């Protein structure tokens, strides 16, 4: 179990990343504390955010600096990979828009753009709802963007995952916003029937999300 003081430090560092202008007293971080922070960051998938805050507002113990340097390189690599996936997803959304496919983006990037440094909040995939009538046209757009159906997935499944072997982008294409097999899924989906005609476009990086 991670000690309470390290858990509190973890939360303080997240606050510092989210609000860089907030004043915070310098914190001394030992190798043991750094190990605890690494574990929590990996568990909650916020490693780049914590590393960013550590670099801005922490005083590392001399014997923790080497470990932090390795951790920082890993975090910056994750940010670079996420930035590449984000750009690929923006290009995909623009291509879907150009093909007049009414895709509805939800979760994923729409939440990450709320962060001050969105690509520091890494995401394993993105989610899109595309009406079944546009399956064939959408598949052509995905393929033109270098994406292919993930191994084991069926193009006609309720959720189909497309992957790009070059950028690492993974996109889950949903045929409904809520799983039909779930108890309340059908009822919830009825509330959002025709949502592709009522979607609100969020302009980001030249693409409509």
Question: Each PLM stretch: what is its role?
Answer:
Residues 1-124, 130-209:
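Conserved NTP-donor binding/palm subdomain of two-metal-ion nucleotidyltransferases/polymerases, i.e.
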């Amino acid at each position: 179990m991670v000690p309470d003081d390290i858990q509190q430090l973890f939360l303080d560092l997240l606050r510092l990343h989210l609000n860089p202008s907030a004043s915070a007293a310098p914190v001394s971080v030992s190798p043991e504390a750094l190990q605890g922070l690494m574990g929590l960051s990996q568990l909650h998938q916020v490693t780049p955010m914590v590393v960013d805050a550590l670099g801005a507002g922490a005083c590392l113990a001399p014997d923790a600096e080497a470990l932090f340097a390795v951790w920082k390189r890993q975090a910056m690599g994750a940010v670079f990979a996420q930035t590449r996936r984000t750009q690929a997803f923006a290009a995909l959304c623009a291509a879907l828009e150009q093909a007049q496919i009414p895709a509805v983006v939800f979760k994923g990037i729409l939440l990450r753009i709320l962060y001050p440094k969105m690509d520091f909040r890494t995401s394993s995939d993105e989610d899109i709802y595309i009406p079944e009538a546009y399956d064939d046209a959408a598949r052509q757009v995905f393929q033109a963007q270098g994406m292919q159906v993930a191994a084991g997935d069926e193009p006609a499944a309720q959720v189909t995952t497309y992957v790009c072997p070059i950028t690492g982008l993974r996109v889950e294409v949903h045929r409904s916003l809520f799983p039909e097999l779930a108890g309340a899924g059908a009822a919830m989906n009825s509330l959002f029937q025709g949502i592709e005609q009522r979607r609100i476009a969020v302009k980001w990086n030249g693409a409509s999300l």
